[in-house]
Amino acid sequence: MNKYELIQDTFHMLQREISPDTGIRLNMPCEEAEEMASLLLEYGLPALRTTRLLSIYIAIKLALLRHSECDNALNGEKLTRSVLDGDYLYSFYVQLCLQWNEHDLLVRLAPVIKQIQIRRIEGASYDDALLRCWELFLEMEEGHVRKSCAI
């Protein structure tokens, strides 16, 4: 499987997992997931787990993107929708981690995501922090590194 097939399979999986009642469209550019897809493929994980991990990553990225739309939302309805979608997607990634028994990942991601949110409020960049945390998690899981994901 190449990274583009992985991304496509992942979006299909996410579409099945997300409640249609939310009205949330999974309209993230594929480019946003390419680096993570490549990283996951490097580790030779089973295909299902690779797709699940990328699903969790995409849910987080979508939440970050939705909340970043709040900066440009001038009217109340669009602002409300961006906040609610982002909040739902943050809880959705937690749900996916629990559903797929990715407890160690959840423990590592939660503080980093909170740090990213704080940095964004302060106007700082977060681009590499999330991917770096994932990389450390995958290395730790493979037994290479025993580091914290703290940024």
Predicted regions and their residues:
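Mg2+-dependent prenyl diphosphate-binding active-site environment of isoprenoid biosynthetic enzymes
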Residues: 7-151
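Extended, compositionally biased accessory segments flanking or bridging domains
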Residues: 3-4
